[in-house]
C-alpha cells in the first residue's frame, strides 16, 4: 500500500512502465537527481526550514550515493520511479523523521522538470561543440580548394562554374545559421522550474534563486504552473535539430551523388566505406546513407513530441513530462552520430580535381558568360544573346561535341540565324568567354564565386566560428562557477557535521 492506494502496482505497470523508466533514469538522470536533492537540502538548511542536524545526516547519505554510484541502491520497481527509490534509501539510512524532511517544499513534478532541463542543457552543449568542429573541418577543406574548379548545378543539370570552396562556403553559412538557432534554444532551456512544487508552488518560504544559482540556471521560470507544464523548450530544440539535420542531409546527398562513378568528383576513404558480398568492385559510401536517414529520425522525433503534447492539459501529466520527451533523447543521439559520421567522412575525402575541371569545360556550364560577352561586346540585349547561345548549344550538341569545342563560326551562324545580322567573331573572343577560370574570377561581387571573394567569405566564417567557440566557453564557465558554489555549500555542511 502506497499513499491512498490499497493495492500494489500491477505486474503490467511494473514491467511496461516502471522498470523501463527506472533503467533509463539510472543510466541518464542519477547524477542530476542527486545534485538537485543536495541543492534543495542546502537551501532548506539556509532558510531555516530544516535543522542543521537533519541536513547534515541527509547530505551524508547523498554523498555516499554520489561516491558509490547507483550500485548502492537496491531498486524496487514497485516504488514507481528512481526518486522514490532514492528517498526510500535515505529514509532507511536516517529514519523517516530525518530522511522524510528532504521532500519539504517540492514535488516530483518540479524535480523531473528540473532534471530534464539539466540533461538537455548538457546535451545541447555537446552538440554545439560538434557543430563547431564540423564547421572547422569544412573551413579547412574549403581553404584547400579556393581554386578547385567544379560545376554548380540547378535541377541537377550543369548551371554555372564555381569552385569547390564556393560550394563549401555556402554550406558553412547554412551551418552558421544552424548554430545560432541551436544556441538560441539555450536561453529558454536554462531556466529553473525548481520550487514550482506540484503546480502552485509551496507555503514554505523556500529560496528559488538559491537553488537556481547552485544548479547553474540563468533565470527562473516565473510561474509555478508554467514551471511544471512547459515542454516547449524541448520542442524548440527538436525544431532546431531538425532544421540542422535537414541541412546536413542535403550536404550528404550532394556528396553521395558526386561520389558516384558517373560523376567521379569525390571519393570517400576506405575506412568509411563498405564492400558488397558479391560485387568485387563495390566501395559503398554508407556513412552518407546513414546521415541522410538519421535526419528522418530526428524530424520524426519532433513530430512525435508535437503529437503527444497537443492534447495534454497545460499542467503535469506523464504524457507531458515523460512520453513527450521519449524520442527527444534519441534525436539528440542521432544528431551527434550524424555529425561525427560527417566529420570523419570529410576527413577521408579525396577530391578529383581533374575530373571536376574536365567536366566543367565540356558541359556547357560556361555558356551564360558567352551570352554576357555578346551583350558587352556586340550590344545585343540579354534576351537576344540568350537566344543566340541557345542555338549555339543545340548545334554543338547535335554534332556530339562539348562546349569546349564551340568555334567562332558556330557563334557567327547563330547570330545570323537569330538576328539576321552578319557579325565577325574571333577565336579569342569565344575562348575567353568560355574559359571557366576567367568566368569565375570575374564574379567578385559580394557573395560571388571568385577565389578572392570566397577567401573573404572564409575569413568572415572563421571569425564567426571563433566567436561561437567563445559563446560555448562562456556557457560552460557559468556551469563550472555554479558547480564551485555547490561544492562550497557541500563543504560547509560537511564541516558543520564534524
UniProtKB/Swiss-Prot annotation:
CC per GO annotation: cytosol
Keyword field contains Cytoplasm: yes
CDD domains for this protein: Argininosuccinate_lyase (cd01359)
Identify the main location: cytoplasm
Q: Out of the domains of life, which is the source?
A: Bacteria
Keywords tagged on the record: Amino-acid biosynthesis, Arginine biosynthesis, Cytoplasm, Lyase
Name this protein carries in UniProt: Argininosuccinate lyase 1
Q: Organism, per UniProt? A: Shouchella clausii (strain KSM-K16)
Q: What is the lineage of its organism?
A: Bacteria, Bacillati, Bacillota, Bacilli, Bacillales
Write the gene name.
argH1
